[in-house]
Protein backbone atom coordinates (compact mmCIF):
# COMPACT_ATOMS: atom_id res chain seq x y z
CA UNK A 1 0.00 0.00 0.00
CA UNK A 2 2.84 2.41 0.78
CA UNK A 3 4.29 2.02 -2.71
CA UNK A 4 0.91 2.64 -4.31
CA UNK A 5 0.40 5.91 -2.39
CA UNK A 6 3.90 7.37 -2.40
CA UNK A 7 4.98 10.41 -4.38
CA UNK A 8 8.61 9.95 -3.38
CA UNK A 9 10.34 6.71 -2.44
CA UNK A 10 13.71 7.28 -0.79
CA UNK A 11 15.82 4.21 -0.12
CA UNK A 12 18.05 4.12 2.99
CA UNK A 13 18.55 0.48 3.91
CA UNK A 14 21.38 -2.04 3.94
CA UNK A 15 21.78 -4.50 1.10
CA UNK A 16 21.11 -8.01 2.29
CA UNK A 17 19.17 -11.09 1.27
CA UNK A 18 15.85 -9.43 2.15
CA UNK A 19 16.50 -6.12 0.39
CA UNK A 20 18.24 -7.26 -2.81
CA UNK A 21 16.11 -6.03 -5.72
CA UNK A 22 13.51 -4.70 -3.27
CA UNK A 23 12.54 -2.35 -6.10
CA UNK A 24 11.82 -4.70 -8.99
CA UNK A 25 9.31 -5.34 -11.76
CA UNK A 26 6.63 -6.48 -9.28
CA UNK A 27 7.05 -3.64 -6.78
CA UNK A 28 7.20 -1.08 -9.58
CA UNK A 29 3.90 -2.47 -10.92
CA UNK A 30 2.27 -1.74 -7.53
CA UNK A 31 3.06 1.96 -7.83
CA UNK A 32 -0.16 3.62 -8.96
CA UNK A 33 1.30 7.11 -8.89
CA UNK A 34 4.38 8.06 -10.84
CA UNK A 35 6.80 8.43 -7.93
CA UNK A 36 10.27 9.84 -7.83
CA UNK A 37 12.67 7.16 -6.58
CA UNK A 38 15.85 8.15 -4.77
CA UNK A 39 18.44 5.49 -3.97
CA UNK A 40 21.21 6.57 -1.62
CA UNK A 41 21.50 3.16 0.01
CA UNK A 42 23.05 0.40 -2.10
CA UNK A 43 22.78 -0.25 -5.82
CA UNK A 44 21.58 -3.84 -5.48
CA UNK A 45 18.40 -2.73 -3.75
CA UNK A 46 17.11 -1.68 -7.17
CA UNK A 47 16.82 -4.08 -10.10
CA UNK A 48 18.61 -2.03 -12.77
CA UNK A 49 16.75 -3.50 -15.74
CA UNK A 50 13.32 -3.11 -14.14
CA UNK A 51 14.11 0.47 -13.14
CA UNK A 52 15.39 1.31 -16.63
CA UNK A 53 12.18 -0.05 -18.13
CA UNK A 54 10.07 1.92 -15.63
CA UNK A 55 11.83 5.18 -16.52
CA UNK A 56 11.57 4.58 -20.27
CA UNK A 57 7.88 3.61 -19.99
CA UNK A 58 7.15 6.68 -17.83
CA UNK A 59 5.98 4.38 -15.05
CA UNK A 60 7.95 6.52 -12.59
CA UNK A 61 8.50 10.27 -12.62
CA UNK A 62 12.24 10.02 -12.21
CA UNK A 63 15.20 8.39 -10.56
CA UNK A 64 18.12 9.80 -8.60
CA UNK A 65 21.00 7.73 -7.30
CA UNK A 66 24.59 7.78 -6.20
CA UNK A 67 24.96 3.98 -6.16
CA UNK A 68 24.98 1.17 -8.71
CA UNK A 69 24.74 -2.62 -8.50
CA UNK A 70 28.43 -2.87 -9.36
CA UNK A 71 30.83 -0.07 -8.47
CA UNK A 72 32.42 1.16 -10.52
CA UNK A 73 29.46 0.77 -12.85
CA UNK A 74 29.94 -1.87 -15.54
CA UNK A 75 29.47 -1.21 -19.25
CA UNK A 76 26.55 -3.65 -19.43
CA UNK A 77 24.55 -1.99 -16.63
CA UNK A 78 21.16 -0.99 -18.10
CA UNK A 79 21.21 2.22 -16.06
CA UNK A 80 23.96 3.57 -18.31
CA UNK A 81 21.35 3.97 -21.04
CA UNK A 82 19.68 6.58 -18.77
CA UNK A 83 22.74 8.78 -18.18
CA UNK A 84 21.42 11.57 -20.42
CA UNK A 85 17.75 11.07 -19.58
CA UNK A 86 16.07 14.34 -18.47
CA UNK A 87 14.35 12.66 -15.49
CA UNK A 88 17.40 10.81 -14.16
CA UNK A 89 20.24 12.11 -12.00
CA UNK A 90 23.37 10.15 -11.18
CA UNK A 91 25.95 11.57 -8.83
CA UNK A 92 29.17 10.21 -7.36
CA UNK A 93 28.91 8.24 -4.15
CA UNK A 94 31.24 10.54 -2.25
CA UNK A 95 29.28 12.33 0.45
CA UNK A 96 31.95 11.21 2.89
CA UNK A 97 34.52 13.22 0.92
CA UNK A 98 33.75 16.72 2.16
CA UNK A 99 36.63 18.64 3.72
CA UNK A 100 34.98 18.38 7.14
CA UNK A 101 34.46 14.62 6.83
CA UNK A 102 38.05 14.08 5.70
CA UNK A 103 39.39 16.08 8.66
CA UNK A 104 37.25 14.03 11.03
CA UNK A 105 38.51 10.82 9.41
CA UNK A 106 42.14 11.92 9.81
CA UNK A 107 41.58 12.90 13.46
CA UNK A 108 40.05 9.52 14.28
CA UNK A 109 42.77 7.67 12.39
CA UNK A 110 45.49 9.66 14.15
CA UNK A 111 44.00 8.89 17.57
CA UNK A 112 43.74 5.18 16.77
CA UNK A 113 47.33 4.98 15.50
CA UNK A 114 48.58 6.85 18.59
CA UNK A 115 46.60 4.54 20.88
CA UNK A 116 48.04 1.49 19.11
CA UNK A 117 51.60 2.81 19.42
CA UNK A 118 51.09 3.64 23.10
CA UNK A 119 49.87 0.08 23.82
CA UNK A 120 52.59 -1.68 21.84
CA UNK A 121 55.49 0.72 22.34
Outline where the language-model segments fall.
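A short, aliphatic-rich alpha-helical micro-motif
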Residues: 2-4, 28-31, 82-83
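Rossmann-like NAD(P)-binding element
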Residues: 2-22, 39
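Short amphipathic alpha-helical segments, especially helix-boundary/capping motifs
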Residues: 11, 25-28, 86-90
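Short, well-ordered turn and helix-capping elements at secondary-structure junctions
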Residues: 15-17, 27, 42, 94
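Rossmann-fold NAD(P) dinucleotide-binding segment
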Residues: 18-37, 48-52
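Rossmann-like dinucleotide-binding domain for NAD(H)/NADP(H)
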Residues: 34, 40-121
Amino acid sequence: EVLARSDVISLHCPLNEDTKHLINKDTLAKMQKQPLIVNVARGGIVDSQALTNAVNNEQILGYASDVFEAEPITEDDPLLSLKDHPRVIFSPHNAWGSESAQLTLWRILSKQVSAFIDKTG
